[in-house]
């Protein structure tokens, strides 16, 4: 145990002694009630578990979230999480034990106290502040310390997340009878990340152990792939860095998915309820799903999606005017717009409005060499055809700025998701007729995307 971790643990010992003086165990031990939220049970089940984390700062990134409001964060996490992790280390993570009761009152899930725990006092303190589980790190503790600390936790009906980061610690975790083992993909000795650690260590943990992959999980593609090795994930920084926390959680759990061709407020609500991030409004007069600005306003009133206006060889002034009056998040170009058009559009649009470009895929992948284009839509033909192209063309390509479109529905969306694009763009496959979305089909598609 050297470098960063050793320094943190040395400082933690000083902190514990000071806190014991300030808040002696005898002053609150009699008020401690056993936990009634069962951490181990919460992570069981057919679906992959998610421990979502409240984290203001970290040693590797500094401050991650300026407007850190634990109650608000928990109120969003409660819709998605199996358990909620709360950083309580003050010096390195700007955490606090005071965050634990706030989160516990804001969400019904078990609350994990995430700290560098080296003394039974910290576990009593965590339970007093309403934590239902605690982190014990084998990189910090010897076997005797671990046994003592986990016995204290279990005596308070708290769960233990046992963290390992190499083969030796993995073997110790098995010998110590750990029920839930977190594999930290970050090396706390030098703060580097390696997702291969989950792939290497998880298969050797054996049956009966719940495996949680921690650190460095940023995308839906990583989650889908690593879910073959792990029973769940602990995710913090990837979410905390985004202003729109709801969208950030959906991006990782479901992908950056869009429902296009919205014409009714109720369909926008159904798309949002199901799990979409983006809603598409088509301003191409020849489309059966075309809407006016007034209709678009009505659609937008239905749900707080991020709205994308779809245009085809439109006048730049018209695109900018609609983007402004509707507060669009992005404009999507579906015609033969060239680089000069994109340059002029970028100059005229507010900088927070992204530019997306749809590209038609037939028997080869088109180049993605536009400047000032934030995302690409790969579709078959001009869009709205309901036909798919040959997805095998996408193998081995970097696709983190691509949405996949064309004939997507419940029967092929998992296969589409496995291609590795940032997200999927649904339209005709979730409709009962052109422009009329079917809430049951929408729910079915997103349930299918979350069935891992």
From Swiss-Prot:
For this protein, the record's SUPFAM superfamilies field holds: Ribulose-phoshate binding barrel
Q: Does the keyword Lyase apply?
A: yes
Q: Which residues form a coiled coil?
A: none
Indicate yes or no for the key word Protein biosynthesis.
no
Gene3D superfamilies for this protein: Aldolase class I
**Indole-3-glycerol phosphate synthase, as annotated region:** 1-256
Name the source's superkingdom.
Bacteria
According to its UniProt record, which reaction does this protein catalyse? N-(5-phospho-beta-D-ribosyl)anthranilate = 1-(2-carboxyphenylamino)-1-deoxy-D-ribulose 5-phosphate; 1-(2-carboxyphenylamino)-1-deoxy-D-ribulose 5-phosphate + H(+) = (1S,2R)-1-C-(indol-3-yl)glycerol 3-phosphate + CO2 + H2O
Q: Cite the EC number.
A: 4.1.1.48, 5.3.1.24
Task: Show the PROSITE patterns listed in the entry.
Answer: IGPS
Instruction: Look up the record and name the pathway of this protein.
Output: Amino-acid biosynthesis; L-tryptophan biosynthesis; L-tryptophan from chorismate: step 3/5; Amino-acid biosynthesis; L-tryptophan biosynthesis; L-tryptophan from chorismate: step 4/5
- Briefly state the protein's biological role: Bifunctional enzyme that catalyzes two sequential steps of tryptophan biosynthetic pathway. The first reaction is catalyzed by the isomerase, coded by the TrpF domain; the second reaction is catalyzed by the synthase, coded by the TrpC domain.
- Name the protein family: In the N-terminal section; belongs to the TrpC family. In the C-terminal section; belongs to the TrpF family.
Report the protein name in the record. Tryptophan biosynthesis protein TrpCF
Specify the species.
Salmonella typhimurium (strain LT2 / SGSC1412 / ATCC 700720)
The organism's lineage?
Bacteria, Pseudomonadati, Pseudomonadota, Gammaproteobacteria, Enterobacterales
